[in-house]
């Protein structure tokens, strides 16, 4: 009896040690999940129809314009032509990538690759790795590179949240690679990240923190993802430089200093 108890104890101890070393959370790839007839499937189909109803050339217009190319259609209105131009294009890449992973729909696949090819054309036209739709982008980023920074909550050098805006492009390219397996998106993402390293390499940490007073979305997360994708630690350093100490340092100390902060900062 004692021998049996001893062996059982060893088995339980080994099982516990294995459980403690195992990942605490595991994810199902979207490709492995299929929805049955349900409100969830109805919602997915509604989303699918909306995604395909959008005109890709209108979403691409700001990116082509800023690259000095002729848009194939006028851009959308409201936020897409009043200063936040191009931000929906980044969201659109993410939506297409996830929808393709979830459904395998060929129309979604073709739409995603049309977007990526056109954006790549714009990226090549600029020649620095940059892709973006903020009006006056090239002048803006040259000012930032020169250390001329005028930052406020929704403003950076007179432009409407350009960091937040370009984060959507970064995230969209990342998702096109991770969810849809696009090697083109991976290279475009790396080139765009290398461009940001060039823009910010001459800025001090103080200048970086000053710039981050402007709404900047989750750029640090995306740069950390690029480090994971490539295995190159220079992108992890970029992620560190884009981490806003005003918000994060108090949290590290278990202090709540979030009152009055804008959620899209992080």
What residue spans do the PLM features occupy?
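Bacterial Sec-dependent N-terminal signal peptides
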Residues: 1-21
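Glycan-recognition and catalytic cores of secretory/periplasmic carbohydrate-active enzymes
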Residues: 20-266
């Amino acid at each position: 009896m004692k021998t049996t108890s001893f062996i059982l104890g060893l088995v339980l101890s080994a099982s516990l040690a294995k459980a403690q070393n195992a990942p605490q959370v595991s994810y199902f790839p979207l490709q492995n999940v299929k929805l049955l007839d349900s409100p969830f499937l109805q919602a997915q189909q509604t989303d699918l129809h909306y995604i395909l109803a959008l005109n890709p050339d209108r979403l691409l217009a700001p990116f082509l314009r800023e690259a000095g190319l002729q848009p194939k259609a006028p851009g959308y209105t409201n936020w897409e032509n009043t200063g936040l131009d191009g931000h929906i294009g980044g969201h659109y890449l993410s939506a297409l990538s996830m929808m393709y992973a979830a459904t395998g729909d060929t129309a979604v696949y073709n739409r995603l690759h049309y977007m990526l090819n056109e954006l790549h054309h714009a990226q090549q036209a600029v020649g620095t790795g940059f892709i973006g739709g903020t009006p006056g982008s090239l002048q803006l980023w040259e000012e930032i590179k020169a250390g001329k920074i005028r930052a406020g909550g929704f403003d950076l050098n007179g432009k409407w949240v350009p960091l937040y805006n370009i984060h959507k492009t970064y995230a969209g390219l990342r998702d096109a690679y991770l969810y849809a397996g696009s090697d083109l998106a991976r290279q475009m993402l790396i080139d765009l990240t290398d461009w940001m390293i060039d823009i910010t390499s001459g800025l001090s940490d103080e200048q970086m923190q000053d710039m981050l007073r402007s709404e900047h979305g989750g750029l640090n997360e995306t740069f950390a993802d690029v480090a994971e994708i490539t295995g190159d630690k220079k992108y992890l350093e970029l992620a560190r430089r884009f981490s806003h100490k005003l918000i994060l340092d108090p949290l590290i100390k278990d202090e709540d200093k979030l009152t009055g902060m804008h959620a899209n900062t992080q």
